[in-house]
Swiss-Prot record:
UniProt-annotated binding residues for substrate: A300, T301, T302, G303, R304, P305, R306
Active site: D13 (proton acceptor), H41 (proton donor)
Pathway stated in the Swiss-Prot or TrEMBL entry: Purine metabolism; AMP biosynthesis via de novo pathway; AMP from IMP: step 1/2
Cofactor binding notes: Binds 1 Mg(2+) ion per subunit.
Binding site for IMP: D13, E14, G15, K16, N38, A39, G40, H41, T130, R144, Q225, T240, R304
Protein family (similarity comment): Belongs to the adenylosuccinate synthetase family.
Cytoplasm found in the keyword field: yes
Location, primary (coarse class): cytoplasm
Gene Ontology BP term (one): 'de novo' AMP biosynthetic process
Keyword Transmembrane listed: no
Keywords: Cytoplasm, GTP-binding, Ligase, Magnesium, Metal-binding, Nucleotide-binding, Purine biosynthesis
EC id: 6.3.4.4
Protein name as catalogued: Adenylosuccinate synthetase
Length: 430
């Protein structure tokens, strides 16, 4: 028996969806434990592209149960839309294959309105929010004002909580943000309709997961975003509002730490970032544009072009430490096919002195200079390779060097977007 957590080891968009899709073959349950529809997983199966924002990637596999844990914040409209799209494609024929924790917090219209209005007023201090209400929903969760899914299903409780919250939110919208107030009747009617649709998916998912573990079933925990976007360990305040690290898999599902056996970090063979915040290896030249265009580095959720840079070993080494990674899956190695020379950031300097770890102080981090090591490119197409030993020697040397720098074994190498374009070195479920 093995239960595996998959986390992003950089700033998100590392290719977790594909890796989760591959590992799902070996799992019984696939569990989402944090975030909301601010993350997009792009999967290519038999040439068909599917983008999921809330529902775990495992839904594309028959016989698997997908669970959305209590650490997620749920937009009912988006969730229902994803269900309908999957059913149109012939997926999710059995509704019992998808469960949602009764304790998830619900994204309300005022959360989205506040999110967008705040970002619009922040000028050059923008965080880079997707505007989907994720942060304000987590604010209400921590402030003990949130509306949970179990509340939405109880007409009396939902009406009371909505009325109380809307009084405060409309004050904020009108008096502080200069926006129009929202209508209680409109929200109540719409969300009561959502409740009727959602009811059949709701469950005590913590209990179900723990029973499955006791029965010897294998669980795969699917993280969203990345380690450097973690609200505690990331480049605060340019972070998301949830715990993206491996520890979030426990708090976000109700499964204890001793039932986690493997933690796999996902890292690109280079690095990208969306939105504002420090990025020491960012490339603003032709190399950066080549990475962006070749790698298709545009957000699955927003369509925004991603910032691109050379592989940063400091970032991934940090992710290895704070997550306790047992392995790293390296994605998009093929994007580097045409480079004559490839750089690796092996460390930073600040004011001319070496930096031991990622600075928590943003003012320091923003002034860190990367220390580069150069390696020759392999200048050949590797997408047809299926065994590590069949990669060009220079590609193998690159992977081995990254492994040395991050002090963690690389257990998988992705060389294209397709499920079959993968080299598995070690299976964490084996």
């Amino acid at each position: 028996m093995a239960n595996v957590v998959v986390v992003g080891a950089q700033w998100g968009d590392e290719g977790k969806g594909k890796v989760v899709d591959i590992y799902t073959e070996h799992a019984d349950d696939v569990v989402r434990y944090q975030g909301g529809n601010n993350a997009g997983h792009t999967l290519v199966v038999n040439g068909e592209k599917t983008v999921l924002h809330l529902i775990p990637s495992g839904i594309l596999h028959k016989g698997k149960r997908c669970i959305i844990g209590n650490g997620v914040v749920l937009d009912p409209e988006v969730f229902i839309m994803e269900i309908n799209r999957l059913k149109e494609k012939g997926r999710l024929q059995d509704d019992s294959a998808l469960l949602v924790s009764e304790s998830v917090h619900i994204i309300m219209p005022y959360h989205k309105q506040i999110d967008l209005a705040r970002e619009a007023k922040s000028g050059d201090k923008k965080i880079g929010t997707t505007g989907r209400g994720i942060g304000p929903t987590y604010e209400d969760k921590i402030g003990r004002r949130g509306i949970r899914l179990m509340d939405l299903l109880d007409p009396e409780i939902f009406a009371r909580k909505l009325r109380e919250n809307l009084e405060e939110k409309n004050f904020i919208l009108e008096k502080l943000l200069g926006e129009k107030p929202l209508s209680f009747d409109e929200i109540h009617k719409t969300y009561s309709g959502y409740a009727d649709i959602l009811r059949k998916y709701v469950a005590n998912t913590s209990l179900i997961l723990c029973k499955d573990i006791a029965a010897g079933k294998k669980l795969l925990f699917e993280g969203a975003q990345g380690t450097l976007l973690d609200v505690d360990h990331g480049t605060y305040p340019f972070v998301t509002s949830s715990s993206t690290c491996a520890g979030g898999a426990c708090t976000g599902t109700g499964v204890g730490p001793r039932d986690i056996h493997e933690i796999i970090g996902i890292s690109k063979a280079y690095v990208t970032r969306v939105g504002s915040g420090p990025f020491p290896t960012e490339l603003l030249d032709a190399d950066g544009e080549q990475l962006r265009q070749t790698g298709g580095e545009f957000g699955a959720t927003t369509g925004r072009p991603r910032r691109c840079g050379w592989f940063d070993a400091m970032v991934v080494r940090f992710a290895v430490r704070v997550n306790g990674l047992t392995g790293v899956a390296l994605t998009k190695l093929d994007v580097l096919n045409d480079f004559d020379t490839i750089k690796i950031c092996t460390g930073y300097t600040y004011e001319g002195k070496p930096v031991e770890d990622l600075p928590a102080n943003l003012a320091v981090f923003e002034k860190c200079q990367p220390v580069y090591e150069e390696m020759p490119g392999w200048k050949s197409d590797i997408r047809g390779v299926r065994r590590f030993e069949d990669l060009p020697e220079k590609a193998r040397l690159y992977v081995h060097r990254l492994q040395e720098l991050i002090s963690c074994p690389i257990v998988l190498v992705s060389i294209g977007p397709g499920r079959d374009e993968t080299i598995t070195i070690r299976n964490p479920f084996a």
